[in-house]
Amino acid sequence: MAKQIQAIRGMNDILPTQSPLWQKMEAVLRSSVSAYGYSEIRTPIVENTDLFKRSIGEVTDIVEKEMYTFADNNGDSLTLRPEGTASTVRAGNENGLLYNQEQRLWYMGPMFRHERPQKGRYRQFNQFGVEVYGIGTADIDAEVLMLSARLWEKLGISDHVSLELNTLGDPAERAVYRDALIAFLEQHKDALDEDSKRRMYSNPLRVLDSKDQNVQAILAGAPELMDFLGEESKTHFSQLRELLDAVGIKYTINPRLVRGLDYYNRTVFEWVTSSLGSQGTVLAGGRYDGLVAQLGGKDTPAVGFAMGLERIVLLLETLELNKDIPSEVDVYVTAMGDSCLVEAIKIAQELRSALPNLKVMSHCGGGNVKKQMKRADKSGASVALLIGEDELAEGMVTVKHLRNDIEQQRVARSALGAFLAELAIK
């Protein structure tokens, strides 16, 4: 027997038993962004490597360690996209969507990062994101947070997530703070772990995000960015908090929250959960006013967020919110003998036309009644339709209920659609 080929480590299949939960989640995401008037954008999976070096930052973990990068036949350096924001900005600049315009966009699709696979974190993962361009005021920051809160409400997990909020100020304020933070870290250099020592000069704000407990103890005495903000940044953050308070969105200010990408400024946020252990962040984002110009466009304010969908699915499963997913099949149509096969197939087609929301599966492959009933039960259908010679002769169909104790019934073929609609099969 030939050796089986396995999936690449960290790149997982979504199997038929899992896909209904994904479909339900994706439907919630689509309906929620639609309610806010956002438009979908779809970008290529492969981009020029420079796009991510210029946007994410050359000294970030993503660019240094995690990107899937290769040379094509022309010698160009290409990369499988590790996140969605940079591609959205590139598409907006290239197609004239962002020049003196407001855009509210959303996207959903696979991303790729070569990191250590673990529960809720994979090398190919699906990301959903929202991006807004052309609005620089705090009210749009509040809107994207309101939208994110709506997602949790619609998914039924509002009680299991909490919002953490911070501001990074503008680039000039952050530069002054950066110098102060480096000076502080230099005083404690010998006590820092190797990762923090490496980041201390190249990306010192990322030290604030260290998972090392000893480093966090040292950082308790570090200067706080809030003390380095100018009036404009303080006002923006104050207005955002006021709007969130007005609509009842609770939050905690986390002065250590920085985000892992270089392009953020002012507002940054994360929704976190305690239900997934160490992988607690389920959605993250913020404002990135300089990125559009950094990638060749005009100065354009921007704000957005992204969420890894595998982690949301894991949270739904952990909270056992995947139990009420409807079956992929409502009605299973059987033919009691070869002479009935043609009419059974015709009946199935008639039902699909008359009741387009009804999920109808026809039995194929022959077999006796016992085999067909076994297949019907395994399909998850609520009812099976038995079509034999007696039924055809009388213009009837036998309806067998598979999920309750109702006795089987004979229904006129002409009334079958109305009968099944009245059953309100879900």
UniProtKB/Swiss-Prot annotation:
SUPFAM superfamilies from the UniProt entry: Class II aaRS ABD-related, Class II aaRS and biotin synthetases
Keywords assigned by UniProt, alphabetized: Aminoacyl-tRNA synthetase, ATP-binding, Cytoplasm, Ligase, Nucleotide-binding, Protein biosynthesis
Cellular location(s): Cytoplasm
E.C. numbers: 6.1.1.21
Broad class of enzyme this protein falls into: ligase
Classification via InterPro entries: aa-tRNA-synth_II (IPR006195), aa-tRNA-synth_II/BPL/LPL (IPR045864), Anticodon-bd (IPR004154), Anticodon-bd_dom_sf (IPR036621), His-tRNA-ligase (IPR015807), HisRS-like_core (IPR041715), HisRS/HisZ (IPR004516), HisRS_anticodon (IPR033656)
CC per GO annotation: cytoplasm
Alphabetical GO biological process terms: histidyl-tRNA aminoacylation
Name of a matching Pfam family: HGTP_anticodon
Catalytic activity: tRNA(His) + L-histidine + ATP = L-histidyl-tRNA(His) + AMP + diphosphate + H(+)
Main location class: cytoplasm
Any one GO molecular-function label of the UniProt entry: ATP binding
Entry superkingdom: Bacteria
Family affiliation: Belongs to the class-II aminoacyl-tRNA synthetase family.
Subunit (UniProt): Homodimer.
Protein name: Histidine--tRNA ligase
